[in-house]
């Protein structure tokens, strides 16, 4: 089923934004035993702690690791390149330019390779370094859906102030890892970024289903090649 991002906003209630922001301040200050941290979702709190121990800055822009021709060559050779049409069809049906979300596909190292979707939102997310070639791994920018999904090997939803990097607090995101259908090694990650609608239950189901569809299509393509 293709996405309809304006439909559902049924994300489960979390601790208030103010409480999360205060807890984040305490963690950045090194107060890992502060009681406010216990009010933060365990998945988020544990990711914050990993980020803090890795000395990730709470406001730094991500590093651009792939640019121009190097990025083009890497994308062309990446195993997820052949899946982009399917990802667009499932997550950006209709007019992507006014979809209300940004869809990103990255490699297993957390580097973003393709970023598509709502043109107005993309002009805003560009400002925080959410661009093709940038490293959004957890150990580079802290807690985010794509980076933490790769770290944990499972789909992840991060809402607003749950992000480790303050530059990302205006945004919410859901991401799911993609694995090689035979070796089960990580190949990359699929992410949707936008407002609260992208951290709904429906959004997680759609992103998970898209990742599984990509894996299935890869396996079918390989079996066809072997049969020829």
Question: Which functions belong to the PLM regions below?
Answer:
Residues 168-177:
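A short beta-strand signature within small-molecule sensing/ligand-binding domains used
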Residues 1-134, 148, 157, 170, ...:
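Intrinsically disordered, low-complexity terminal regulatory regions
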């Amino acid at each position: 089923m293709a996405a309809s991002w304006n439909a559902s906003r049924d994300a489960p209630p979390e601790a208030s934004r103010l409480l999360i922001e205060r807890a984040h301040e305490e963690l950045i200050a090194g107060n890992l035993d502060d009681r406010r941290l216990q009010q933060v979702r365990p998945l988020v709190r544990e990711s914050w702690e990993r980020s803090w121990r890795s000395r990730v800055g709470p406001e730094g822009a991500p590093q651009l690791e792939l640019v121009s021709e190097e990025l083009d060559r890497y994308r062309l050779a990446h195993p997820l390149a052949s899946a982009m049409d399917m990802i667009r069809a499932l997550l950006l049906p209709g007019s992507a330019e006014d979809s209300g979300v940004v869809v990103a596909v990255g490699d297993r190292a957390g580097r973003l390779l393709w970023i598509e979707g709502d043109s107005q939102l993309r002009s805003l997310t560009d400002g925080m370094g959410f661009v093709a070639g940038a490293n959004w791994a957890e150990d580079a920018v802290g807690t985010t859906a794509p980076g933490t999904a790769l770290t944990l090997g499972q789909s992840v939803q991060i809402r607003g102030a749950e992000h480790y990097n303050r530059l990302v607090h205006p945004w919410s995101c859901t991401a799911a890892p993609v694995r090689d259908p035979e070796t089960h090694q990580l190949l990359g990650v699929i992410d949707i970024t936008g407002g609260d609608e992208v951290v709904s239950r429906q959004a997680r189901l759609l992103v998970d289903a898209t990742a599984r569809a990509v894996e299935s299509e890869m396996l079918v393509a390989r079996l066809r090649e072997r049969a020829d």
